[in-house]
C-alpha cells in the first residue's frame, strides 16, 4: 500500500518452523492485482510439499471475487487446498458489496462446503468504516445462513460488535 517496493514478500517455511506452527491458511490482502489466487495456490502447494499443512482462501479484498476456476464455489469444490474466500468490508479499500451480493457469495460458499465437506469460510477483513459488521449480523439475523461461515477479523476496535457477533452463535 505504498508502491511496488512495499509489496509483502512471499511467506517462508522457516518462519512457521521456527515459530512452532504446523498448519497455515494463506490469503491475499489488499493486493489482488500484482498477486493472484493462482500464485497463492502455488505457494500453498509448495508448503504442503515441504511438509507443513497448508490451505488457502480464494480472492483478495475485492468484489466480485477473483478466482481460479471462474467461481468461488468451484474453487472450493475442486481445489483441495482452498477452504473459503477472502473479502473486505467496511473499509476504504473494499469494493463495497451490497447485502444481496454478500448473501449470494456466502450462499455459494455454503453450498460448496456442504458438497465438498470443507469448512467453507468467508474470511472478512473488517475496516474502520462506521457500518462495521452490522451487514453480516443482519444477514445472520434475517436468513438461515449459519454464522459459522463468517470469519470477521480486526475486531479489536469494535469490541461491542464482536461481543454481539459472538453471542449470535
Question: Model-predicted segments: where are they?
Answer:
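Active-site core of metal-dependent hydrolases
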Residues: 108-169
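Generic detector of short, locally flexible boundary/turn motifs and exposed helical patches
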Residues: 19-23, 50-55, 86-91, 114-120, ...
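Active-site-proximal loop/turn and secondary-structure-junction residues that shape catalytic pockets
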Residues: 30-32, 60-63, 89-91, 128-130, ...
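Alpha-helical scaffold segments that flank or form the walls of functional sites
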Residues: 2-56, 68-80, 100-111
